């Protein structure tokens, strides 16, 4: 192999290794920031990872909202009409949050029936429902 070819091969291998390392770092960084979506049924079945930041969506169950006498703590249940989980949240709830409302909560699973939310998102108007919640609920109605 001539010195010119050897040098080109070395440069090519070096460039490929740098690109591979950069791609690996990007994928690692993206993995840290991904919030996967789960339904209450998937959480009850144990499919959701514990102690990882995820999203859960469903409908707020009737007569399930319990507010603390002092502070901003609130506890409520969300359902996908098959299973129900208890969500605890400390903070100000959105103005549109109410019973029978479709919501998405971000936070961590504490066990198979409890979820600690760090953020609660409610739908915007009477016709809007988060796409993940809509498809998950549609799947339950079909069954």
UniProtKB/Swiss-Prot annotation:
Bilayer topology annotation: Single-pass type II membrane protein
Membrane spanning residue stretches: 9-29
Subcellular location per the Swiss-Prot or TrEMBL entry: Cell inner membrane
Repeat among keywords: no
GO biological process: cytochrome complex assembly
Pfam family, one: CcmE
Positions in the Cytoplasmic compartment: 1-8
Gene Ontology cellular-component terms listed: plasma membrane
Residues engaged in binding heme: 124, 128
Family: Belongs to the CcmE/CycJ family.
HAMAP family: CcmE
PANTHER family: CYTOCHROME C-TYPE BIOGENESIS PROTEIN CCME HOMOLOG, MITOCHONDRIAL
Task of the protein: Heme chaperone required for the biogenesis of c-type cytochromes. Transiently binds heme delivered by CcmC and transfers the heme to apo-cytochromes in a process facilitated by CcmF and CcmH.
Name of the protein this chain belongs to: Cytochrome c-type biogenesis protein CcmE
Species assigned in the record: Legionella pneumophila subsp. pneumophila (strain Philadelphia 1 / ATCC 33152 / DSM 7513)
